[in-house]
């Protein structure tokens, strides 16, 4: 394929309600949409989902914009691309910056599938048309209000609830939820809020039949996670420190976890994500798909990727209305009896809403 143009929309979508984690508060989701057009007029869409603050991982929206325009796009234009798997090799000389790489790499995958007149799901092997999904709930100090949120999620049919926790907000809300919902698939996510000194408190969580405890310790730690996993019956899940297949291999070798939260942007794109999914399946690591408050473009990709049979555990792929009043695609994603339908159109299978793009974004033609 020959790239004819690259455009970007800098988008800001307000959230319906603020989302609070152990490291911050999110009131709107800022992201960039990249549109890559080939010589045939096909367009591939990729979403740059890095947050504005470096409080989740190192990348930010501003740093990745710079890396994309000054380094990755020039590399992408050095030669004609035949297969989307080539992109990760082309980008190898740039160290790190996985989310910037993923924004362009996923756009190339979408473009490639459209050139082949195929859905992107056809490149993922056997897939399902509908997949079970879960919901993530932010820190809610008002515990009666938290119970209402859980009740609403259950009534809507979400098949798993994840609760964000931090020191001082952990055992009490978990115990309350478990008291009212004894059979609910429930997990917690600490976003690196704890240290090994908090072991006694984390051991208390072992009594509530949690599906897993996600990322209790630092994003660069494997050793303390391994010690914690030896101490707990509950499965430990790693998120922030899984940036590559090599990180999964290290985690397995050390016994740092028994589950992986896989986020396509966090590992540099689809090619690396496919290798990680295969590795987890081969080594009995429970792998599931996480989210980054994506718009409909990233959400479509997540649904397609999670349609692989490997992803049996419900991921963080909520309905559009969970977070946003409006989206940048024409058809919102809807929850139906705890499942969501995987888009089957060409590429990622969604159409952009030009009206909403004009309403919520600033346009820039890069080339």
From Swiss-Prot:
Its EC number is 4.2.1.113, 5.1.1.-. One of its GO terms (molecular function) is isomerase activity. It comes from the Bacteria. One of its GO terms (biological process) is menaquinone biosynthetic process. It catalyses: (1R,6R)-6-hydroxy-2-succinyl-cyclohexa-2,4-diene-1-carboxylate = 2-succinylbenzoate + H2O. Its cofactor is a divalent metal cation. Transmembrane segments: none annotated. The active site is at residues 164, 263. Keywords: Isomerase, Lyase, Magnesium, Menaquinone biosynthesis, Metal-binding. Pathway: Quinol/quinone metabolism; 1,4-dihydroxy-2-naphthoate biosynthesis; 1,4-dihydroxy-2-naphthoate from chorismate: step 4/7; Quinol/quinone metabolism; menaquinone biosynthesis. Mg(2+) binds at residues 189, 214, 239. Belongs to the mandelate racemase/muconate lactonizing enzyme family. MenC type 2 subfamily. Homodimer. Converts 2-succinyl-6-hydroxy-2,4-cyclohexadiene-1-carboxylate (SHCHC) to 2-succinylbenzoate (OSB). Also acts as a N-succinylamino acid racemase (NSAR) that catalyzes the racemization of N-succinyl-L-phenylglycine. Since the gene is encoded in a menaquinone synthesis operon, OSB synthase is probably the physiological activity. A pathway that requires NSAR activity has not been identified in this species, so whether NSAR is also a biological activity is unknown. PANTHER family: O-SUCCINYLBENZOATE SYNTHASE, O-SUCCINYLBENZOATE SYNTHASE-RELATED. This is o-succinylbenzoate synthase. It comes from Enterococcus faecalis (strain ATCC 700802 / V583). The lineage of its organism: Bacteria, Bacillati, Bacillota, Bacilli, Lactobacillales. The gene is menC.
């Amino acid at each position: 394929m020959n790239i004819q143009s690259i455009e970007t929309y800098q988008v800001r979508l307000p959230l319906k309600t603020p989302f609070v984690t152990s490291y911050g508060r999110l009131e709107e989701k800022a992201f960039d949409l990249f549109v890559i057009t080939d010589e045939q007029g096909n367009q591939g869409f990729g979403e740059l989902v890095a947050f504005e603050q470096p409080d989740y991982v190192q990348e930010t929206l501003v740093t990745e914009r710079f890396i994309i325009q000054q380094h990755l796009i020039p590399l992408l234009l050095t030669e004609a691309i035949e297969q989307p798997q080539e992109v990760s090799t082309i980008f190898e000389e740039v160290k790190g910056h996985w989310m910037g790489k993923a924004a362009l790499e996923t756009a190339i995958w979408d473009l490639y599938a459209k050139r082949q007149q195929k859905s992107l799901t056809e490149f993922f092997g056997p897939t399902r048309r509908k997949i079970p999904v879960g919901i993530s709930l932010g820190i809610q100090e008002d515990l009666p209000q938290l119970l209402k949120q859980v009740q609403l999620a259950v009534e809507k049919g979400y098949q798993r609830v994840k609760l964000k926790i931090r020191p001082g907000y952990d055992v009490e809300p978990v115990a309350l939820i478990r008291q009212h919902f004894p059979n609910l698939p429930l997990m917690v996510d600490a976003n690196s809020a704890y240290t090994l000194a908090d072991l006694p408190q984390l051991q208390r969580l072992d009594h509530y039949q949690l599906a897993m405890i996600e990322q209790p310790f630092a994003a660069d730690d494997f050793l303390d996670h391994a010690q914690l996993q030896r101490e707990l019956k509950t499965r430990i899940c790693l998120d922030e420190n899984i940036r590559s297949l090599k990180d999964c291999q290290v985690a397995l070798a050390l016994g740092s976890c028994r589950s992986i939260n896989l986020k396509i942007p966090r590992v540099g794109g689809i090619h690396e994500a496919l290798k990680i999914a295969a590795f987890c399946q081969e080594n009995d690591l429970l792998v599931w798909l996480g989210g980054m408050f994506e718009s409909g473009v990233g959400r479509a990709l997540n649904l397609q990727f999670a349609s692989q049979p490997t992803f049996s555990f419900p991921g963080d792929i909520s309905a559009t209305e969970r977070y946003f009043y409006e989206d940048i695609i024409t058809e919102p994603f809807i929850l139906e009896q705890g499942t969501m339908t995987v888009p089957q159109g060409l590429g990622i299978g969604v159409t952009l809403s030009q009206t909403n793009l004009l309403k919520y974004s600033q346009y820039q033609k890069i080339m």
